[in-house]
Amino acid sequence: MGPTPVVTTHKSAPRHPRMFAGVAGRAARALTTAASALALCVGALVVAPAPAHADDTITTQDYFSYYKLDQARAKGYTGKGVTIAMIDGPVDTSAPELAGANITDKSRCTVNSDNKSKTHGTAIASLLVSKNYGFLPDATLYSYQTTFEGQAPSEDCNPDIGTRLDGLASSINFAINDGAQIISISIAAGQIDAKFEAPLNAALSRAINQGIIVVTGMGNTSTDNDGGSYASRNGTVGVSAINLDGSFASDYSSYGDSVTTAAFGGPIKVRDYDTGQISDTSGTSIATPIVAASLALARQKWPDATSNQLLQLLIHTGSNSQQAWNNRTGYGAVNPGALINTDPSQYPDENPVSQKADDAYPTAEMVRDYGDGRADAPLGTFDDTYVYRGTDDIYIHAEFLTQTPHLGTSPAYHRK
């Protein structure tokens, strides 16, 4: 059985088994990359290319009926008035699936992309805002391109200040500056200990403080606590993948302590720019924007709810009985119908993913210091709203900050 119909609050989604893994029914493509490189969460695994040409149009997807999106559209839930961001590969806005979609490339520098990353980025954008089968045909989508493994960043992506304009941390900040309410990230880092990536910790601290929802995939390595997944970070909604029958996608989806929810991971049809065909692909890259889009539908329905209440709504309407958590699907698969039909004002204004684990980053202290203006001033370089309020006078004339520092004015100094 699928998720709840949009016309009712009854939860009919099945519970999910405790085992899940990989990509598209065959060997998953690992997300291991070079230390500073990014990878595609979906693993770009192509399954059984369909005998079609790239100039054919994809008109529907299996998830459209599974999530009862026809009912959502009939009731006017189309993402109208919501701004969502994706950090990914480039989007081919000339693709017929994206005709009429409201998409703007907000990248701050030139990214040298390839067909693989264009296939991925265009697929994610189509899932979000395609007029044919997107969750949010009337939403505003901002795209931010990043440089993937094997690609050389352009010179204009490397400013003198040292933080790349096509990096994840800067892209999160740009998305928030531009007014995005929800950010979907279907990429992964290299298999490294990234706890001390200060710019990323600062960007997520900002998102937590300003109520911006960040959704990211668990990865496609069929492993526990995939080291390449950004879902291990505090402040992120970690998404694993399920199949259409509700079972955990154990042949590819990663899992672990940081999973929050799950969604259909494929296969979906994609426009493959390498082969010139329409192909099928699966991965947590697909599940991630489904969760982000579902939250966007909830944002449209409940404009007065805080982002924390929407996150509480997500975990309280998951498919697991009595909101029980497990390390496969978190609190259970996302249920867009229940998100639309359940009033989030009944839930506390508390972020349920801000502190996933005691040893996860950014720490509660980092989040608090950023909100208090005590984070080192360079960490606010791409934050148009950041005011340094600490006591280090070397930042009094910091030209890299948009806002003038106000030394010694942090509320932390007056807090008992």
Go through each PLM region and give its residues:
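Structural recognition of the beta-strand scaffold that forms the well-ordered cores
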Residues: 83-87, 140-145, 176, 181-186, ...
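Subtilisin-like serine protease catalytic core
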Residues: 73-84, 89-104, 112-161, 233-234, ...
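Gly/Ser-rich catalytic serine loop of serine hydrolases
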Residues: 113-122, 221, 279-291
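C-terminal subdomain of the subtilisin-like protease fold in secreted/lumenal serine endopeptidases
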Residues: 184, 302-415
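Substrate-binding/access-modulating region of protease and related hydrolase catalytic domains
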Residues: 150-229, 279-282, 286
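Protease zymogen maturation seam
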Residues: 2-7, 19-25, 31-81
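Solvent-exposed loop/turn segments at secondary-structure junctions
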Residues: 89-93, 109-111, 133, 147-151, ...
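Extracellular S/T/G-rich loop segment that most often corresponds to the catalytic His/Ser-adjacent loop
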Residues: 228-300, 304
